[in-house]
């Protein structure tokens, strides 16, 4: 087994990652495979925080004519559903897991309290952050960057459908070029599809590296933590 590059990580999953080929809802086989990969990190002594998107349940911008604020709050509820699903999968494997939400839902989750989240991580518990930042107009990418800064994560592990960052869509263009490493400024100036600009800027300001990799094989989560070069790293360079 290789040496762990990171002590504390923030795993960012899209909601679609939980949906699998269905594209909608939650595929519990996939949730379980992700949970098994996260358990491996915990067993290696790595502290894991996670943020899950909500696009498998609700895509706010697809709500044509709907008030943006209302749509965003619906998205926050969707992320909380996903957080509970992932918590259930992890706990079925014996991994102590806490869900903390930015909007209070005391019957099902803890409210987000930074000091409590840090304490959970130090005790080896996985902490899943739900409901985004609790504010409309901010994406779950931004929530992941914000929580990563707050819990002092060493890196954001950004799980995607593609195996890194390309200069154009590799699904549409055969000549798409993959980057092994990029700076935050290059991502922002070239408008590359990593995180949205708010999240990228937050990572840049707080010097949090972003490691982009494909989740087609959940084992990749462990591989990137052990330093295998299978994705794209975004950092100060």
From Swiss-Prot:
Homohexamer. It catalyses: UMP + ATP = UDP + ADP. UMP binds at residues 54, 72, 133-140. GO terms for cellular component: cytoplasm. Catalyzes the reversible phosphorylation of UMP to UDP. This is Uridylate kinase. One of its GO terms (biological process) is 'de novo' CTP biosynthetic process. Its EC number is 2.7.4.22. Belongs to the UMP kinase family. PANTHER family: URIDYLATE KINASE, URIDYLATE KINASE PUMPKIN, CHLOROPLASTIC.
